[in-house]
Amino acid sequence: MRRRSSSLQLAGGSVIVIYAYLVANLTSVVESFEPLIQLPRSGSFRNRPRYERVVNVRNYGAKGDGLSDDTQAFEDAWKIACSLPLRTSIVIPSGYTYLVRPIDFAGPCRSRVTLRICGIVIAPSNPDVWDGLDTQKWLYFHGVNRLTVEGGGTIDGRGQEWWSQSCKINKTNVLLSLLHESPCRHAPTAITFHRCKNLKFKNLMVKNSQQMHIGFTNCVRVIASFLKVFAPPFSPNTDGIHISASTRVEVKDSIIRTGDDCISIVSNSSGIKIRNIVCGPGHGISIGSLGKSNSWAQVHDVRVDGAFLSNTQNGVRVKTWQGGRGFASNIIFQNVRMENVSNPIIINQYYCDSVLPCANQA
């Protein structure tokens, strides 16, 4: 094991300090990751607690024909489940496709809630549905403790129209944005968990998100496992799992193939464990970016143990903006295998994701 440290001293005393452990113990067989392909069966209720109230969205008016708006049925089912004093499951049955507009699942709830997504949940394909709404949200959970989301089903962001409008794809939008005529708009994260504690998110497929697929922000004690996260390699900013300002997050036994970072970990996050991950295509596993706009940033105690990265732009990466302040420390990457990776290990302390050169802030 080698300890590698790097620091950047900037004008005005700004500094980002990075400490990372790079462990070159690479696995030699891809077969060790094959069990990840076989996720638990959809709709399995063998582990259902003995005493549990079941709320079925079909009983609240969800048609599941992929055309009718089922948002109200989902909202009503959530309100009932969240208000009950006993453990409750919301069931989204298999065999149906549910069209759901941007929706908030607000806590706190009176007891434990399990959301079992056994069918297919799809987003509106037209970005205009978000007019007047927060364009960064689609399925948004906030302030919920002891929540489990599982079920073997699929969450489909249908983000193709959003991708075509992205400034990374549509260069005309970049020019118009510079002229303040058509600013580049944010796109939704498919499913966001904000200020949730004791969260379990498992056994689901999340695909074709408008932008990021899964976001954990300001969360504590999270286990994300047995996930499949898929988007085309050309889809812009479609990070698989994005962890921000969260502590004690474990991501394991999952396959992530997207157009951006498979997993990204940004400021004020700590106690992050990542293991048994298949990544690629995509941009690898990233710490950052950190310190944009001269901000303070810190990430510490991150361990990546067991990953196979193939056909990715980067392998394991730490990226910080010039002018930023703070630190990234105790970062460990071990038992990582890479194939056809352009930049296997990269520490970039002058990160810039702008189409135009970034102004010198040092």
Language-model features, listed with the residues they occupy:
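Extracellular/periplasmic carbohydrate-active domains that bind, remodel
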Residues: 2-362
